[in-house]
């Protein structure tokens, strides 16, 4: 019963964050007696019913699923999900006119504190190594896993991120230049922060050395041109090249006219690949057997929820402590002030630090889009474009290396990242200059499908999509 109550709350929770209030059905409907043309509950009513379902589930669930029950819902996950939903309830997405001083933040804080403290009491803790989250099943940080086991159930992750030459498919999930810039330097500060130990100046200078002195998570998450990539079955010292004419066509990115070769995936990839979660012990022929568990929720996310709510209700010491723990585990230098490069001078600065750290720590885990919606920051993307990085081999004097010489050196893995110059290219390369983000206010809540409204005329459409239903808490 506890499992089913949680699943009902979870299913409704996922609908609420996309659409606002939905018809929240709490009893089995009888097609002969009940009116099946139900109306939408208000968003406030849905949150109340969802939290009641979670509280009832928590009272019935074991503290922590162990042994043969590992992978089943337990109190740790239910409490953490409750905190996550109350964070949404308090968020700007649902409270556009009173974003950070509404009464719901205290409720979110209490739930987040309870979830964090309970997880810690059950032995959940940050892993020593960041990469263990993806490559060590049953690690200490997992709050709830999605379990995979070859051959019964495998994950397609490896096929979506690897270069085509080492996979059985073409990568369709690649980083952008903005994601590269988001990672701090080794001292925790931005590359363009003049107070930083590793300050490099402006973006043009940084582009030519973007892989140097970075947050260690950068190496764990981003596979860049000429980086070592010891995939099983490759030669000793193998480097993954992306430069046109040097890398195989399916792996290359760019439009260098001096090469005499063209890249075939310019409209799909970005000159970089995702390294996060890549199991290099799998050779190309075994890539489809990838079966590491996926950490659907891990302690770091719970800590971010706790930090965000704590900051908004005045417990800024708690928020900063959560961020420091995460950066310490990442391997960032503490600095003389022990702040790991964080800018945490006040409520607004801490708020931004939390969102920035979420972007890095949780990258490629499916959170960023929802974070931008939840905080009503999506429209900050308007007018921006996506960029990838083309690598072009150069000589010591900076002149462009002949393709014959570049190929000869690359065949022996003698070309390192320093032996290239880097140029930003629009993603996709075929895009026109006007291909920029244009986010509408209406995107913070999605519409109900027209087909569903035709099936049930009592379903109101959202007021930002031509209807009358208010999906917010206001």
Name every feature range the model reports, one short phrase each.
Residues 1, 5, 106-114, 310-320, ...:
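Secondary-structure transition into beta-strands, especially the periplasmic turns and strand N-termini
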Residues 1-75, 84-103, 267, 271-297, ...:
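Aromatic-anchored glycine-rich loop motif in surface-exposed flexible loops
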Residues 3, 23, 141-143, 217, ...:
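Beta-sheet entry/capping signal
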Residues 55, 72-79, 84-255, 380-407:
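An aromatic- and glycine-enriched ligand-binding surface/loop that stacks and positions planar moieties
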Residues 219-302:
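C-terminal low-complexity, acidic/polar tails when present
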